[in-house]
Amino acid sequence: MLHVLSPLLADFCAQYPQIEIELGSNDHLIDLIEERTDVALRIGRLQDSAMHARLLGHTAIRILAAPAYLAQHGTPQSAADLAQHRLLGFTAPTTLNQWPLPDGRGGLLEISPAVRASSGETLRHLALAGNGIVCLSDLMTFTDRESGALVPLLEHEREHVSQPLYAVYYRHRTLLARTAVFIDFLAQQVAKMPWYRAQA
């Protein structure tokens, strides 16, 4: 998420110079109170009912690979071809390894990764280095696709699946003014992003 936030911070700091910002990056869900965190950004379905959440938008997910990987291993022409390729996936939860391809039983194709990582950003770097085929959000990979560093695959079979992006904070905590203006700012800026979708 830092690659999304970083370009926005100069404008936010110019508008609100009195607000001090401390950023943290974590691959796992954190306790916001224990970590003294006002707001967190989360992608995907929320599990914690103790959270207030503001939906900032949605982002599509796609199957991607680097040109170098495809040059060496070939380009899959169908979902069935993926069985012959090195797939990159998440350690947990397993739902993140359900790719937006039909499984023939009315659901999504669940893959068995050859390489697993806990972080989408780690998987992105593995894919960029030619280590295999990955499924990630447009939020994370839009610039890679635009530059040609990652190539979309199986677009003709891809289900139009997207993930929600939320700003979350604890339900029992009074929303601080600084948090409110930051969330409002994020909502305005995210809506301008090229990967943004208002609805799933």
Show which residues each predicted segment covers.
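Beta->alpha turn/N-cap motifs
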Residues: 27, 43-46, 65-67, 136-139
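Secondary-structure junction motif
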Residues: 86-105
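Short beta-strand-to-loop elements that line the ligand-binding cleft
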Residues: 21-25, 109-119
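Ligand-binding "clamshell"
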Residues: 48-53, 144-154
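Central regulatory/effector-binding core of bacterial HTH transcription factors
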Residues: 1-52, 199
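Flexible hinge/capping segments at coil-to-helix
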Residues: 50-88
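C-terminal effector-binding regulatory domain of bacterial HTH transcription factors
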Residues: 142-147, 157-200
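A ligand-binding cleft/hinge motif common to bilobed small-molecule-binding domains
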Residues: 126-150
